[in-house]
Amino acid sequence: GLGDVYKRQDSEGNYLFAEDGVEIVPEDGITANTVKLDNFTDNHPWYEYDETSGEYKRFQFGKEHVDQLDNQQITCDNIILQYSSCPAYDGNGYLNIDAISGGEGKFITRGKAIDIRWEKDSPWGITHYYDGNEQEIRLNQGTTWVEIVQNDRIDSVTYQ
């Protein structure tokens, strides 16, 4: 499936990952076994944490979100909610997503969520994510899904 296309490679990546055999569980995080992103008006995506696998299963349109390459439900080990300004680009409803200026967000993994801050050094640079102690976050090894959440819809995201 698509997840296999982007498996860990021997190259410099955009993220910092935990060392082999190390699991990241945010100490002071809020419970995030279910994360609903009601800010998306069409597909209403959400994630459900599977404690057995340590992964989040993704859903949308009221059902499992399935990878068309292998017919398996999409899963991820880490979710990053990146809060961004998203003004209308034109009269057709297209959004001009600001993925450059930096902002706040959430890092979600292993049933927990913590507040983060994100920034970029340049328009084409790598996005860096920092915890409340200004340390760049380390992700659990595996798949990471980044969701852009419009600044004016942050309150529509729920955690259970």
PLM segments and residue spans:
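A surface/extracellular/periplasmic glyco- and lipid-processing/surface-interacting theme
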Residues: 4-160
